């Protein structure tokens, strides 16, 4: 393959994830995006819990029962001359570190906001993670077919709370029962909405020109007049779209629509393929790797168990950073210094697997893993380096785990260590006793762990509350001071799954006091894998 053909393939790639608060419509928008990418024929509206029509992107058994997307799956589809990789992120009230880490593997994010509710808690947290890498953000204001808040007010809230400038690309005409469509500020066109056509791609009627009398006929004179006045205000008060500001994560283009009604999603996709960056350079511990390099490099950001219920396998998800992957390729796993031949890599359409013949920078591939691959592992064609920026996040919830059958302690430890390597949960072993404490970012992780311990390791475990409210990884450059710190705080120290020392605090107040008392000790909220 010539360098110019390779460059063309890489330039076509767009890799993004969707971030939202639960129930803002993320799963629905995922489906509609796949519909436009012709990856599915009709959208199985997510009735979620217990209906036979399951959304394409929700699949492990527990998800099917509960109608939530626990696992981060990957879907690839063509759109507008590009090849789009969509990484689905767990979006339910209970999510996990997987969600955070997935955001480290994308070049762009789509933020979905329920226009009736505005900025919600989970959206804030996820935006903080995108800030670690200044990821570009597109915004989709959803649920325009319902009664919503004043759009200007919601934009103002996004700017204020998320510290990002908003540039409206489309603007709604009415909402709820009187929702008539959206006007495209860049194209000077109005797209008219028809309700009840959400399952398929609809032929949308377009009215060219803001002052076209056809618009008054289509939406009614009063609404048209009100809309034109509103638009004048919007154009006066909002930011012009600036591509550089978008790429640096300082400005977000905003699109309005209804994912359920399948309206406005294509405008957002057009913006994504036009403005979102092709695969970006990434830092390693020795240098920066650029997507156009010939040699293959990639890193593992997530490990998923039991994608195939018939086989107890685990699949490691790897983001290709540079070069071209080919079937049967020999790659160096840098951490273990071993060369492995990858003959059966996978590509995904959420649960439907197909074997990869080739993959390029920006793509995500799955590697079969029998416990030898860990999160953060770097694969190269021989070069010794490690990609950085794939962190562990300090858990926010903690439980003590206890066995129903004390003779199975060995299986429990093995299971917990493997689950922690996958990033399903974090394990802490206090220095002062024999407890096993598990830490998570979302409550659902505890359920996932106990059901997987039972099905995969034949271990029945129960959780008990424990007096821990937060954890920090600790280190210090002054050996003497660190020894003193360890001696005086032994009751609050624990080793995590990778034997890294951490401070487990009963309260935030305790943590703050300890940090003040030991200014030379570094307390970290994230830790590199």
Swiss-Prot record:
GO MF annotation terms: GTP binding; GTPase activity; guanosine tetraphosphate binding; translation release factor activity, codon nonspecific; translation release factor activity, codon specific
Assigned keywords, A-Z: Cytoplasm, GTP-binding, Nucleotide-binding, Protein biosynthesis
Principal location listed in the UniProt entry: cytoplasm
Residues covered by the tr-type G domain: 11-280
Residues where GTP binds: 20-27, 88-92, 142-145
Subcellular location(s) per record: Cytoplasm
InterPro entries according to UniProt: EF-G-like_DII (IPR053905), EFG_III/V (IPR035647), G_TR_CS (IPR031157), P-loop_NTPase (IPR027417), PrfC (IPR004548), RF3_C (IPR032090), RF3_dom_3_sf (IPR038467), RF3_GTP-bd (IPR041732)
Coiled coil: none
Domain of life: Bacteria
GO cellular component, one term: cytosol
GO BP, one annotated term: regulation of translational termination
Protein family membership: Belongs to the TRAFAC class translation factor GTPase superfamily. Classic translation factor GTPase family. PrfC subfamily.
Function comment: Increases the formation of ribosomal termination complexes and stimulates activities of RF-1 and RF-2. It binds guanine nucleotides and has strong preference for UGA stop codons. It may interact directly with the ribosome. The stimulation of RF-1 and RF-2 is significantly reduced by GTP and GDP, but not by GMP.
UniProt-listed NCBIfam families: prfC, PRK00741.1, small_GTP
Identification of the protein by name: Peptide chain release factor 3
Organism of provenance: Yersinia pseudotuberculosis serotype O:1b (strain IP 31758)
Gene designation: prfC
